[in-house]
Regions:
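C-terminal interaction-tip segments
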Residues: 1-26, 83-93
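Exposed aromatic-hydrophobic patches
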Residues: 22, 62-72
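Short secondary-structure capping/turn segments at boundaries of alpha-helices and beta-strands
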Residues: 18-19, 66, 76-77
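Short, surface-exposed beta-strand/strand-loop-strand elements in extracellular ectodomains
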Residues: 37-56, 88-92
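Intrinsically disordered, low-complexity regions of eukaryotic proteins
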Residues: 6, 15, 34, 49, ...
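Solvent-exposed serine/threonine-rich low-complexity stretches and specific carbohydrate-binding patches
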Residues: 10, 52-61
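Beta-rich globular "head" domains
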Residues: 13-47
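Noncatalytic modules at the cell exterior or secretory-pathway interfaces
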Residues: 29-31, 70-85
């Protein structure tokens, strides 16, 4: 599968080092990390300047990890690490 940012939520399943095509301000409601393989798998999301805006670590029960309500705009968005075959869902306002 490939990244799909055509709807809401955005579905990110591939990290290729290139930023997502939204380098301007993005209004994020919340994010979810799901479908990872083992406890301790990691998902890291940064802004366009490389500042970490969310770090998710896989839980022992393999349930999805939720960010809680962001409710703010971030300057660009990039998923720099996505372990264990997981997916990142980004809900946009």
């Amino acid at each position: 599968m490939a990244n799909d940012i055509s709807g809401n939520p955005w579905i990110i399943d591939t990290v290729n080092g290139a930023p997502l095509p939204f380098l301007s301000r993005v209004f994020v409601k919340h994010m979810e990390y799901a479908g990872y393989a083992v406890q301790g798998n990691t998902c890291i999301v940064t802004d366009r300047n490389g500042r970490q805006i969310w770090l998710a670590t896989g839980a022992f029960d393999l349930e999805e990890v939720r960010s809680g309500d962001f409710g703010v705009a971030v300057n660009g968005l990039n998923c720099t690490q996505l372990d264990g075959g997981g997916i990142l869902r980004v809900y946009i306002k």
